[in-house]
């Protein structure tokens, strides 16, 4: 059975860390935190938010996994102090427009403090998310330094994230990236508590089938596990990423090269037939 990862510095001057337990790639049963029950591809605490349609148009549905009896809090651009939600849906009146940040907290039987975070973008009046990202929140968390809007995160793109505890940067901390296809990479936060994450080019061909291949998406989670003041914390940030745009160009170039090759080969084929 796969175990959770723990990172501990082995020398503050060197900024090193070591791995206490094994990998977490094996699928895990979904906890009953959210009203819907879905399988998940990681044992890390996971929070996902999706804009809803229909009767609650413009609202957001939130799903949680691997979080025992979590408490859900929503932060918006207009209300950065946080609002505790009683359910797993947020109406458009609650969210407003722009970026909305969600975090869910809980605890394991071994008293490890768990937190999972994510965000969703809702179209509307453009508002800067800088105050939302800079807000001080208690506990251990991973925060992107900028939030994707229309383009989203894509394979091979680079994004910076910061590890914080009670709003303060945490240097020399191991940060693990795990993607839905199973890619795993690790970085160590710098003096500002930041890591620059390069997303892998790991979409399987099956996921790119169909006419809208560039709109395919897969999940990822960033995780940090650290003991602070005698207490263990495990926090994650999860979202989705999309195929590299170069895949589209590569396909077009391949089709073009094939067509050009056929044009060049046509006279040779014709001459061969005439000689025959």
How would you label these PLM feature ranges?
Residues 1-107:
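N-terminal pre-first-transmembrane soluble regions of secretory-pathway and organelle membrane proteins
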Residues 2-10, 18, 239-276:
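C-terminal single-pass membrane-anchor helix
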Residues 26-50, 116-171, 238, 243-246:
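Beta-strand-rich domain onsets/edges
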Residues 72-77, 143-147, 174-188:
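Short amphipathic beta-strand segments in non-cytosolic proteins
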Residues 80-90, 94, 185-206:
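Glycine-centered loop-to-beta-strand initiation motif
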Residues 86-121, 206-228:
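Short, aromatic- and glycine-rich surface loops/edge beta-strands on solvent-exposed regions
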Residues 167, 179-181, 228-230:
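Solvent-exposed strand-loop boundary residues in beta-sheet-rich modules
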Residues 221-246:
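Juxtamembrane amphipathic/hinge helix adjacent to a transmembrane helix
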């Amino acid at each position: 059975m796969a175990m959770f990862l723990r990172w501990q510095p082995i020398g503050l001057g060197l900024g090193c860390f070591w791995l206490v337990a094994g990998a977490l790639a094996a699928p895990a049963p979904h906890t009953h935190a959210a009203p819907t029950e879905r399988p998940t591809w990681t044992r890390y605490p996971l929070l996902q938010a999706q804009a809803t349609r229909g009767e609650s148009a413009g609202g957001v549905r939130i799903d949680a996994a691997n979080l025992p009896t979590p408490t859900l809090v929503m932060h918006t651009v207009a209300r950065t102090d946080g609002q505790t939600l009683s359910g797993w849906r947020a109406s458009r009146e609650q969210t407003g427009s722009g970026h909305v940040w969600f975090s869910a907290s809980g605890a394991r039987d071994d008293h490890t403090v768990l937190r999972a975070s994510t965000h969703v973008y809702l179209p509307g009046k453009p508002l800067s998310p800088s105050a939302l990202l800079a807000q001080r929140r208690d506990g251990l968390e991973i925060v992107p330094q900028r939030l994707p809007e229309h383009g989203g995160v894509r394979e091979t793109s680079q994004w910076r994230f910061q590890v914080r505890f009670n709003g303060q940067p945490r240097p020399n901390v191991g940060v693990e990236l795990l993607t839905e296809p199973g890619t795993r990479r690790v970085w160590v936060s710098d003096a500002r508590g930041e890591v620059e994450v390069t997303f892998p080019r790991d979409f399987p061909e099956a996921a790119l089938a169909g006419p809208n291949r560039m709109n395919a998406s897969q999940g990822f989670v960033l995780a940090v596990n650290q003991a602070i003041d005698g207490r263990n914390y495990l926090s994650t940030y999860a979202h989705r990423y999309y195929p590299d745009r170069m895949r589209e160009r590569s396909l077009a170039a391949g089709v073009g090269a094939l067509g050009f090759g056929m044009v060049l080969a046509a006279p040779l084929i014709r001459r061969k037939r005439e000689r025959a």
